């Protein structure tokens, strides 16, 4: 182990169920960047699920970018469980809950921060028009949803 800097990148989608209609709105594409600094060693792969609990959390998704998980963190391998030492955030009301499943071996003590932002390029490629995450997440009319997106929404709206 050594004192080193680390970085991670990722991509994903966000879908929101409309509180008015109960139906799911079209998916919005996001990307993430994480930087860390500290004593750390290992390699891992992670899957992340964000649950938006409050309207305040939903409004965070409307912003161009927002931060998650800033502060010291201890990661314990090999099962990839994490212990977050940022007690202020743990003890305050949560607007967005993050769950992850991690594979690999990683150990260390590091300071890190994650930034989630709108993936404008992916939105444009998928919808063939410039569309904001806000427009997608609120279900704005006039967005041409591709067939694959319509099939996804049809399946999601069954539940």
Question: Locations of the language-model features?
Answer:
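Small-residue-enriched, tightly packed secondary-structure blocks
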Residues: 1-159
């Amino acid at each position: 182990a050594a004192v080193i800097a680390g970085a991670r990148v990722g991509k994903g989608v966000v879908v929101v169920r409309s509180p008015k209609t109960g139906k799911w709105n079209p998916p919005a594409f996001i990307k993430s960047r994480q930087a860390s600094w500290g004593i750390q060693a290992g390699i891992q792969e992670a899957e992340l699920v964000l649950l938006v609990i409050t309207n305040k959390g939903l409004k965070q998704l409307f912003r161009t970018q927002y931060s998650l998980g800033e502060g010291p963190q201890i990661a314990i391998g090999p099962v990839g469980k994490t212990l977050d030492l940022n007690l202020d955030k743990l003890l305050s009301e949560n607007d967005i809950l993050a769950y992850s499943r991690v594979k690999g071996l990683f150990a260390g003590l590091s300071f890190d921060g994650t930034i989630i932002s709108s993936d404008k390029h992916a939105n444009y490629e998928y919808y063939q028009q410039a569309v904001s995450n806000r427009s997608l997440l609120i279900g704005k009319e006039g967005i041409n949803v591709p067939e694959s997106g319509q099939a996804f929404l049809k399946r999601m709206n069954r539940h």
